[in-house]
């Protein structure tokens, strides 16, 4: 299961971090060295004697080393990387998939060292490196974690002693940006210090890593407790843990917070790793985890304040997983904005409430709560698909600014810097 892989990965990462060698670990072939199954496939190219196959009516059964894989013949023809089928400069397919005979079979198959050659009925030859087939097979993907993460509760995060990144280093050096993104990808939160306490500098910081996602709240939002928008965030009240924009079909990926001024008490920010809590549910009540990943819910935002009139609806389960490896990639949890439950029959509703209660209990455990006092100059980035946030009530005048970032662009920046994202 995905959490077993993450637990193993987390242990390896923590050992690397203790030795001050995390950057080395992150560079190793996109984290492959951190996974036991990736190690299994290393240096197998020379072991061609361990490669055998059997041709079935509609697919090839291939055993390479100790792994059995199955490839549909249409798939093998469609994924040909020859010059006439695939443009290696643009990394785009040239072959018209609809032109491939759905009953196609190779005339011959031969192995030359670590490469399989397929000759098709029309004479076209497709070649595949065995390691490429392993990496891209369904059986191989079932063992892969899409994004390595370190799951945490408050103590685990504090014990990691992750350093913040300085504003100038973040803006001016690849090393500073990469260090920030390493922390963010692994833990779902990251801080930048010594930022001038203005909206303009906060925007400059955000644009270093991503395009800013414009929403119904604008590009950069700036708010106090004046209830200028129809949202509890625009008050002095405490906010329970939640993820933002659950009422969007695609919730915003990253959230940026900068407290520009606070003349009063309270107002600490609450952070909870939703994936850590979900892991506890999966371990203790796997059937409830499954239910939370299967039942679609509506979340809704209705606003009629001043000139702001909006009615947003987003639909999706609380826990979102990749179907091929059951890896969790998004948690959509906001009890404020959850709409009427009318997407499942009555006999599922009670079981859903029980599962929701189990997850909520985990999210509310005091040991899972990380409390942070935001202050001018300290900017917080939150993975809104993973980490829930909230706040305690406060007194006095408090100004915050921030924005949402497009998740694709943050991950794109990370990949360009050589990180696994």
From Swiss-Prot:
GO cellular component, one term: mitochondrion
Catalytic activity: N(6),N(6),N(6)-trimethyl-L-lysine + 2-oxoglutarate + O2 = (3S)-3-hydroxy-N(6),N(6),N(6)-trimethyl-L-lysine + succinate + CO2
Keywords: Acetylation, Carnitine biosynthesis, Dioxygenase, Iron, Metal-binding, Mitochondrion, Oxidoreductase, Transit peptide
Cofactors required: Fe(2+); L-ascorbate
Classification via CDD domains: CAS_like (cd00250)
Cofactor binding note of this UniProt entry: Binds 1 Fe(2+) ion per subunit.
Modified residues (N6-acetyllysine): 179, 236
Top-level EC class as recorded in UniProt: oxidoreductase
Enzyme Commission code(s) on record: 1.14.11.8
Pathway(s): Amine and polyamine biosynthesis; carnitine biosynthesis
Pfam families documented for this protein: GBBH-like_N, TauD
Primary subcellular site in the record, as a coarse category: mitochondrion
Annotated Fe cation binding sites: 242, 244, 389
GO biological process: carnitine biosynthetic process
Disulphide linkage map: none
GO molecular function, a single term: trimethyllysine dioxygenase activity
Record: transit peptide: 1-15
Location within or outside the cell: Mitochondrion matrix
Quaternary context: Homodimer.
Family of the protein in this entry: Belongs to the gamma-BBH/TMLD family.
Function as written in the Swiss-Prot or TrEMBL entry: Converts trimethyllysine (TML) into hydroxytrimethyllysine (HTML).
Name used for this protein in its record: Trimethyllysine dioxygenase, mitochondrial
Source organism of the structure: Rattus norvegicus (Rat)
Lineage: Eukaryota, Metazoa, Chordata, Craniata, Vertebrata
Gene this protein is translated from: Tmlhe
């Amino acid at each position: 299961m995905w959490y077993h892989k993450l637990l193993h990965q987390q242990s390896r990462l923590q050992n690397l971090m203790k030795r001050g060698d995390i950057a080395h670990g992150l560079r190793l072939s996109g984290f492959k060295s951190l996974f036991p199954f990736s190690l299994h496939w290393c240096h197998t190219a020379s072991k061609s004697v361990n490669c055998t196959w059997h041709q079935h009516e509609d697919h090839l059964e291939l055993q390479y080393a100790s792994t059995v894989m199955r490839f549909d013949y249409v798939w093998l023809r469609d994924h040909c990387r020859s010059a006439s089928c695939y443009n290696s400069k643009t990394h785009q397919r040239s072959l018209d998939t609809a032109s491939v005979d759905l009953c196609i079979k190779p005339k011959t198959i031969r192995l030359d060292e670590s490469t399989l050659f397929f000759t098709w009925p029309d004479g076209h030859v497709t070649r595949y490196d065995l390691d490429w087939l392993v990496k891209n097979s369904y059986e191989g993907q079932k063992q892969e974690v899409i994004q390595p993460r370190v799951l945490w509760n408050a103590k685990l995060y504090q014990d990691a002693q992750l350093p913040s990144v300085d504003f100038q280093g973040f803006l001016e050096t690849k090393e500073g940006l990469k260090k920030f993104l390493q922390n963010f990808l692994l833990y779902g939160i990251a801080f930048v210090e010594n930022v001038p306490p203005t909206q303009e500098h906060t925007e400059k910081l955000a644009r270093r890593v991503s395009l800013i996602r414009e929403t119904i709240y604008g590009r950069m939002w700036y708010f106090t407790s004046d209830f200028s928008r129809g949202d509890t965030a625009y008050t002095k009240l405490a906010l329970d843990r939640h993820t933002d924009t659950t009422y969007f079909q695609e919730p915003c990926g990253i959230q940026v917070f900068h407290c520009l001024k606070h003349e009063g008490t309270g107002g600490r920010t609450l952070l909870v790793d939703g994936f850590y809590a979900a892991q506890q549910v999966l371990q203790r009540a796997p059937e409830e985890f499954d239910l939370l990943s299967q039942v679609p819910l509506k979340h809704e935002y209705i606003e009629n304040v001043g000139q702001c009139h909006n009615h947003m609806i987003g639909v999706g389960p609380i826990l979102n997983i990749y179907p091929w490896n059951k890896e969790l990639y998004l948690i959509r949890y906001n009890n404020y904005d959850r709409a009427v439950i009318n997407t499942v029959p009555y006999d599922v509703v009670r079981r859903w409430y029980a599962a929701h209660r189990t997850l909520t209990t985990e999210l509310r455990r005091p040991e899972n709560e990380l409390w942070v006092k935001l202050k001018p100059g300290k900017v917080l980035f939150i993975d809104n698909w993973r980490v829930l946030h909230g706040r305690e009530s406060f007194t006095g005048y408090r100004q915050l600014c921030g924005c949402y970032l497009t998740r694709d662009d943050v991950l794109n920046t990370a990949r360009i810097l050589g990180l696994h994202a």
